[in-house]
C-alpha cells in the first residue's frame, strides 16, 4: 500500500516536472516569436520618394542652357496623409493622379499650380530636359532611359550623369513600408542642373541658322569663328521630334543623320585650293582665255558660260568661277604638292569633335589617280572622286578668310 503511494507520488512529481518544462519551452517559444514580430510591426525603416534624378546642363558659349531650359512644379505625396480632392485640383493629369492615389502608394505628379506643402506634400521645381523645340538637336543628341544615346548626351554621358543629384523626400516607415506621418520628413533638393559642359555654340546664331534652314529639304548649315575656328552653329535638316524617335528612325529622309558631318561632292569652292596651289607655285599672275570649253585627253570639259569668259587672270577667274581657267592652271602643278596642300587643309581627314561625333573623312584622290589628266582636270574645280563634309568646307573657308 505504501509502495503504491510512493510510486504514485513519483509519477505525480514527474508529471509536474514535465508540465513545468513544457511551460518553460512554450514561454521561450513565445518570447522568441515575439522578438521576430517586433521588427515587422515596430522597427523603423525609410521610404524615399524620388521626384527626379537630375543631369548636368549643356550650355552654349555664353552660358545659355541648351537643355533644362524650362522648369515645372512637381509634387511628391503620401496618399494617406492628404485629401484627394483638395490636392487633385493641382494635378496636370487628374485621371492619372486619381489612379495613383487609389493605389495608396506614395507618388509624384506634375502640377499646374503650386500646392501648399505639408507633412504629406513636398513640392519640387524640376527642369524639363528637352522642350517642344530643341535647339541644336543634332549636336545635343538625346537620352533614353536616363542614358545618352547620341550627340553630346552620349559623348559626355558619364560627366552629365556624374553630376546628377536627386530631388527626393524621405520618410520613416514601419516594417511593412507604411509611411509614419508625424515622425518628420527629410527633403533633398538638387542644384546639379547648374553644372555641366560648355560648348562653342552661340545659341543666337544657331537659332538664325535653324530658322532660315528650316525650308531646306535635306542639307546643313555650319558657321564658325574665322579667327579661332570655333563652331558657332551647326544645323542639319530635316530635324526630328524627341517625342517621335521611332518615327524618325523610319523616316526615309533620315532626319537623325547629322548632314554637316557627312561627305558630299565638293564643287567650285575647291577652286580656292587650286588657286592657293597656283600662288604657292608662283603662278599667281597666270592668264588664260576661256572659250567655254577645253579638251583633255579626248574628254570635253565645259565652263558654265558656254560662250566663254575670254582672257582672265586668277582674280577674274575666281570671281566668274571659270572651270576651264582652273583646269588649265592645274596642269602645270606638282601633283604631290597639290594633293598635300588639299590634305593639309583638312580634305581626306576625319573631324573628331568628341566621342560619338566625328565628321566623315570624305574622299581625297590618290596621287596615282590624279596622275590621270582627266581626273586632275575634274579635281581642279571640285569634281570627280573628291568629296568632303560641310564642316571640312567651313574649315577651308576659315583658313583662307583668317589669313
Protein language model regions, located:
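Periplasmic/cell-envelope proteins involved in peptidoglycan metabolism and beta-lactam response
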Residues: 1-245, 286, 339-344
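Beta-lactam-recognizing serine transpeptidase/beta-lactamase-like catalytic domain environment
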Residues: 65-67, 225-268, 273-403
Amino acid at each position: 500500500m505504501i509502495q503504491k503511494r510512493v510510486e504514485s507520488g513519483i509519477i505525480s512529481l514527474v508529471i509536474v516536472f514535465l508540465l513545468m518544462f513544457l511551460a518553460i519551452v512554450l514561454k521561450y517559444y513565445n518570447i522568441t516569436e515575439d522578438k521576430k514580430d517586433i521588427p515587422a510591426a515596430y522597427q523603423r525603416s525609410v521610404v524615399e520618394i524620388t521626384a527626379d534624378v537630375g543631369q548636368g546642363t549643356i550650355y552654349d558659349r555664353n552660358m545659355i542652357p541648351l537643355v533644362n531650359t524650362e522648369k515645372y512644379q512637381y509634387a511628391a505625396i503620401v496618399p494617406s496623409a492628404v485629401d484627394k480632392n483638395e490636392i487633385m485640383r493641382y494635378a496636370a493629369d487628374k485621371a492619372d493622379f486619381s489612379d495613383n492615389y487609389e493605389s495608396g502608394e506614395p507618388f509624384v505628379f506634375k502640377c499646374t499650380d503650386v500646392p501648399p506643402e505639408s507633412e504629406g506634400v513636398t513640392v519640387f521645381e524640376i527642369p524639363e530636359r528637352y522642350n517642344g523645340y530643341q535647339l541644336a538637336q543634332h549636336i545635343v543628341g538625346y537620352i533614353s532611359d536616363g542614358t545618352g544615346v547620341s550627340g553630346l548626351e552620349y559623348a559626355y554621358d558619364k560627366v552629365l550623369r556624374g553630376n546628377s543629384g536627386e530631388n527626393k523626400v524621405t520618410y520613416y516607415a514601419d516594417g511593412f513600408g507604411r509611411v509614419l506621418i508625424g515622425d518628420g520628413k527629410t527633403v533633398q533638393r538638387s542644384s546639379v542642373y547648374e553644372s555641366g559642359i560648355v560648348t562653342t555654340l552661340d545659341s543666337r546664331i544657331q537659332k538664325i541658322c535653324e530658322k532660315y534652314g528650316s525650308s531646306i529639304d535635306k542639307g546643313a548649315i555650319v558657321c564658325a569663328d574665322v579667327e579661332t575656328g570655333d563652331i558657332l552653329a551647326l544645323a542639319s535638316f530635316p530635324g526630328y521630334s524627341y517625342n517621335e524617335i521611332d518615327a524618325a528612325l523610319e523616316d526615309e529622309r533620315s532626319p537623325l543623320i547629322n548632314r554637316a558631318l557627312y561627305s558630299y561632292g565638293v564643287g567650285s569652292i575647291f577652286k580656292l585650293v587650286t588657286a592657293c596651289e597656283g600662288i604657292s607655285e608662283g603662278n599667281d599672275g597666270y592668264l588664260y582665255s576661256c572659250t567655254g570649253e577645253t579638251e583633255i585627253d579626248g574628254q570635253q570639259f565645259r565652263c558654265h558660260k558656254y560662250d566663254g569668259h575670254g582672257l582672265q587672270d586668277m582674280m577674274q577667274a575666281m570671281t566668274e568661277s571659270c572651270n576651264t581657267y582652273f583646269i588649265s592652271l592645274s596642269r602645270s602643278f606638282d601633283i604631290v604638292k597639290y594633293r598635300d596642300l588639299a590634305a593639309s587643309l583638312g580634305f581626306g581627314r576625319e573631324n573628331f569633335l568628341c566621342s560619338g561625333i566625328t565628321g566623315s573623312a570624305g574622299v581625297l584622290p590618290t596621287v596615282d589617280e590624279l596622275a590621270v589628266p582627266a581626273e586632275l582636270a575634274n579635281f581642279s574645280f571640285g569634281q570627280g572622286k573628291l568629296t568632303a563634309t560641310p564642316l571640312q568646307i567651313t574649315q577651308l573657308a576659315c583658313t583662307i578668310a583668317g589669313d
